[in-house]
Swiss-Prot record:
Belongs to the DEFL family. This is Putative defensin-like protein 30. The keyword Secreted applies. It is found in: Secreted. It comes from Arabidopsis thaliana (Mouse-ear cress). The lineage of its organism: Eukaryota, Viridiplantae, Streptophyta, Embryophyta, Tracheophyta.
Length: 77
């Protein structure tokens, strides 16, 4: 019984770490629905995400909820 509660605590701790807001400005890409999405950052930093992404040379962009944050994703195919 004690080991299952320890396991549950570790899973809970990992979820907190993974979902916590991060100030890391590294860009990451994810493949989804036939295209690549580049994460530019928090939508609060890019209020017009679509315009920002087009200025960066991408097809466009949109703010999507990922965890507790709204992130600006630029679309690249």
């Amino acid at each position: 019984m004690a080991s299952s509660s320890k396991c549950a605590f570790l899973v809970f701790l990992c979820m907190i770490v993974l979902l916590a807001p991060s100030e890391v400005h590294a860009k990451s890409m994810a493949k989804a629905q036939g295209g690549w999405y580049l994460v530019e950052g928090l939508c609060s930093k890019f209020p017009d995400c679509n315009k920002h992404c087009k200025e960066q040379g991408f097809l466009g962009g949109q703010c999507l909820k990922l965890g507790v944050n709204m992130l600006c994703f630029c679309i690249h195919t």
